[in-house]
Every structure is written in structure tokens, then in C-alpha cells.
Amino acid sequence: MSKYYLGVDIGSISTKAVIIDDDLKIIAKEYLETNGAPIDATKKVIESLKKQIEKSKEKIELYGIGTTGSARNLIGSILGATIVKNEITAHAIGTLSRFPDARTILEIGGQDSKVIIIRNGVVVDYAMNTLCAAGTGAFLSAQAKRLGVKIEDLGKVALTSKSPAKIAARCTVFAESDLVHKAQMGISKEDIIAGICEAVAKNFLNNLCKNKKIEDKVIFQGGVSKNIGVKKAFEKLLDKKVYVDEDSHLFGALGVAILSKKNSTGYIPFDFNIKDINYKVRSNECNGCSNNCELISVYDDKGIIDILGSRCGKYTKTVSWKLT
């Protein structure tokens, strides 16, 4: 009987999950919005995986469960994960499984972005931007709504532009103000959208890729990788081909599923029914820096399970996760 492995990537904007077999083939997958409720989102993606498995009439026995993403400790505790890993490692492993010769990973998610430099199959450098929303999936969604365009159509509309507008995307406030100004000037919606896509790519490269050598093969991943306009903008600015896989938005979940396979110690009795757990939530504002993040502490009678909402990663480093 084949062995299978579950990977879950719980982000602030979206939650992704995959089940892979011993050959690293994805046999079930799901991508849903987190909507500020990581536990509920996880229940939904696991339920979806369960239905896909039942439909295929395949008997699934798990030999590994992995979690990654901003709520990885919390969800790892709930699922009884055998491995919990940071996003950099998970995304790199997921990418290398599809692109063994990858040397640069550009990743833009819902509220953060990152560049990962790989040499000889090993991560040698990386940079993350979790402090500014400009250029993230949430930013693009907000601008699409403002312009009356479906987010899934944003990239296609951008490709119809003949003269992309110059949009200042260094800050969401400036970008939105500039967008309104350009519209008032009579610049077409297509040119504004193309300008937004180019601004996102330019902002990413200027902020995250300073002093970093971007070498082929360049892989674009994360939810925003599905925006063909941003992909084309990266290719234009880098003068390189940028690759996007059909599962590029799932690479974090794929990567941690692969890691759970590598660290498997045997069969895991998991019935895909997440039981309700007793936990408490306490919110408070962190005054450690000018971000003033709204933190959400999740804990049970044994202590803190996870702290969510830290944009600088301060509390990700201090929360210890233990398999119970």
C-alpha cells in the first residue's frame, strides 16, 4: 500500500494544503482564504481533501504531517504534525521538487513577499518583507476592487495595455493616491492596471533584491504568481524568463509535505476529522517598535500555543512548539 504525506501552509490571507504520494505527486490539494480564522480555514481545507480522497476511492494512510506559514505552530499542535518548518525552507524544498535547477525564487503572498537565493540546491541567502503591504496580494486585491476588476482578471487586463502608467508603489497610501490621480487624468484602466503590475515588480526588486544576484532559473511563486501581468513585468525588468508552475501557489504546502516524508517515522492514525479543541485567545498590542502590531495569543491550560500577528517575526522565534 502506498504511503501518503500531508502538508499545510497557513498564511494570514490564504490557507493551502496538499497530499502527496511517495513519488511526490500531488493527489489532492486545496487553496482557501484564511479570513482571519486559521483553525476554521484548516478545517475547511482538510474537509476538502477528505472529499477528494473519498471521490477517488483511494485508501489513504498518512506517514507524515507537516505545517508551515504564519500559524504553523498553532495548526501543527492541532493536527499533531510530525514536522513544523519556516516558510523559507518549505518554499525552497517545494520549488526544488519541480525545478531542481532553480537559483532564484521570487515569492509574493497575501501580506508578505520574499526572495530566496539558491545555489547547488541549497538556500544561501534570502530576504523577507513583512512590514509593508505595498506590492502584496492584499494590495493588488484592493486596487482591483477600486478599479472594478476581478482580481483573477487583473493580469489579463494588464496585457492589453499599450502604454503602462507609472505608479508609485513604494507605499500603499502613495500608490492609491497616485492611482486616483492617474484615473482623473483620463488614463485608461488598462494602462493603470499594467502600471500597478510593473510597480509591484519594481518595488519587489528594489526592496528585496538589493545586492543580490538574480540568476537563472528564476521561479515566481505565491498567490500573486497567478497574475500574468506581474510575471511579465518581472521578465521585462530582469530581462530573463520567469517560470510559474501550475501549483506555484501551493509550493509551501508541497515543501513541508516533502519534509514530513523525509522525517517520517511510521504510520499516523489520522481520520481527516479535526476535533474541536479547548483554547483561549487573548489580544494585545505590541509596543516593541513603530509597527504596533495587534498580537493574538492562543493558549491552552499547558501554556501558549502560538502568537499570531507579528509582522517582524519577533514572536515566531520565541514560541516553542512541542509535539503532544
PLM features per residue range, with description:
Residues 175-210:
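Adenine-nucleotide phosphate-binding core of ATP-dependent small-molecule kinases
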Residues 21, 28-34, 53-88, 124-125:
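Short beta-strand-loop/turn "lid" adjacent to the catalytic site in phosphate-handling enzymes
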Residues 1-23, 102-119, 288-300:
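Gly/Thr-rich phosphate-binding beta-strand-loop-beta motif of the actin/hexokinase/Hsp70
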Residues 70-71, 199, 210-237, 248-251:
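Glycine-rich phosphate-binding loops at beta-strand->alpha-helix junctions
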Residues 4-44, 125-126, 130-131, 311-312:
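Short glycine-rich, Thr/Ser-proximal phosphate-binding strand/loop in the N-terminal lobe
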Residues 93, 137-141, 245-272:
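Glycine-rich phosphate-binding/hydrolytic loop that grips phosphoryl groups
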Residues 35-39, 120-163, 171, 262, ...:
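Glycine-rich phosphate-binding loop plus the immediately following alpha-helix
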Residues 82-88, 235-254:
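Conserved phosphate-binding/catalytic loops in two-lobed NTP-binding clefts
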